[in-house]
Amino acid sequence: MIRITSRSVKGAAGIRSVSSSTVRLNIAPKVVSPPVPPPVKPQGSEIPPPPPPPPPPPKAKRFSLFGFLFKTTLLATVVYGGTLYAATKNDKVMDFVIDKQLPFHEELIDLIENGSTEDLQEAWEQLKNKFTDVKLPTKDDIDELTQKLEHRGEDIIKETKKKIASTHIGHKSGTDLTPTEQLQRGVEIESVKKDVAHLPLIELNSDLGKSVDETVKQTITSFNNFIQSIDASSLATKDDKLITSINTSVNQLASRLNSLTKDFDNELQNKLKVSQTELFSSFTKKELELTENLLHQFSTEKQQLEAKLNQKLSQEIQAARAAISQAASNAVAMVRIEQTKNFEKLVSEKLNEERNGRLANLEKLNDRIVELEKFAEGFETQIVSNHKKAIIHQAVSKLKSLLLAPAAGDKPQPIKPYIDELTKIATDDEVLALAIKDLSPLITNESTHSILTNAQLLSRWEQLAPELRSASLLPPNAGLLGHLASIVFSKLLLPVKGVKEDGKDIESVIGRVESSLARGELDIAVEEAANLKGWSRKLANDWVVEGRKRLEIEFLLGLIESESKII
């Protein structure tokens, strides 16, 4: 907008220069006075230089009413704002503010308590828009004003041509008459009346006067000055040049207005694009923030719901298990009672029939009783076997949990009571009896924490690895010096990264054992350690024994569990 105004001012200055140049043609030249010669000083006398003037006294600081009012207003604003802010922190000050009913205290306190930087920015933008939203003339208004100026300029040119042409046509002067006519003509006194026709000035309509730019107003003013100069001058012989200059000025003004309109439209489009981009970026930012907040809330609610559902599900599962076990035991008891009742009822009916039939069909009754006894024995055997299965399964599960995966906080417990319980139950099955017989010497004297876990075996193997490295470097029949040298050189061995399947050196064996233990393949690790030879095999013998003991216990417990399922 500033560029458009400066350009329009330059255009108006050019138009005014044309009008002023036309006026200067009738102005008489100024008389320049001759230069005055400088005074001549006499050579014989010397005048002393005057003393320097005294320094001016310091000016007293004038009283400024505007500064006094500004400082007073600023101090009152700070005191008032500080009082309202203190009212939000102190109840006594709040009571004072409410009692005195300070102006706008409710709105300002609400703004201090609930206001934010975004609200202040929004209020500042609204205030800024009120001052910056100035109504500018549209393109249609500018085009309409340009057309009116062109038509008005054409009318002025036509009227100027008419008035200039009318000055040429007049009465014949005395020189146009013949000498005889001049002698015969009497002396006449003619009163000369000079009628000066004034050209119409350019005026704007009242509805366009408010929306027209200041540059256009200055241009119209220069046009009016030019018309007045035409009225005051007698430039009849230079009408063509004047008309040409007017036409060129009007054309330049029209082209300038068109260029200004285009520049204004382009700048407006650029500002609209920039504002649209800023709004889109702010909208995208707000959308991302809302999405992140919603996702965070969703994940939190999801975790809470999952925890509640898992807790509820575990409680329901435990309750269902207890209900199912109780229902099963009740069903078995009810079946036994029902069978006993049916049996007694059947026996009583048969006895009554025999009594009524005088002990007739005694053999049929005996056969029926035998069948009932077989059925009762088979049903009882099935119930006993199912009970044994359940007891064996519980005992094996308990042994596995105690031996193979003991809890760190549990106290050591003896294993013999569980073995005795299995021995009592498995008297009828040969496979179970043999498995329990082989398992008894392994864990009879052991506790729940004496069998090493995979993690403990891995830790012991890592502690044993330096000794194995030093032992692998011992020469045959090594003495004290050989042992010391092997210890020193074992420190220089670099650990092997990865697993070498075909490596027979001690580092490859150590790496394969550690990898197998990390994967839970204890049998492969024990096999690798058992294949060691020499002094290394003797050092690893205790570890191999513990690993084999764990493998044997795992195998026997798995065998007992599998056999209990097929009883």
Swiss-Prot record:
The keyword tRNA processing does not apply. Residues 31-59 are annotated as: Disordered. Pfam families: Mitofilin. Disulfide bonds: none annotated. Residues 88-567 are mitochondrial intermembrane. Keywords: Coiled coil, Membrane, Mitochondrion, Mitochondrion inner membrane, Transit peptide, Transmembrane, Transmembrane helix. It comes from the Eukaryota. Component of the MICOS complex, a large protein complex of the mitochondrial inner membrane that plays crucial roles in the maintenance of crista junctions, inner membrane architecture, and formation of contact sites to the outer membrane. Plays a role in keeping cristae membranes connected to the inner boundary membrane. Also promotes protein import via the mitochondrial intermembrane space assembly (MIA) pathway. Belongs to the MICOS complex subunit Mic60 family. This is MICOS complex subunit MIC60. It comes from Candida albicans (strain SC5314 / ATCC MYA-2876) (Yeast).
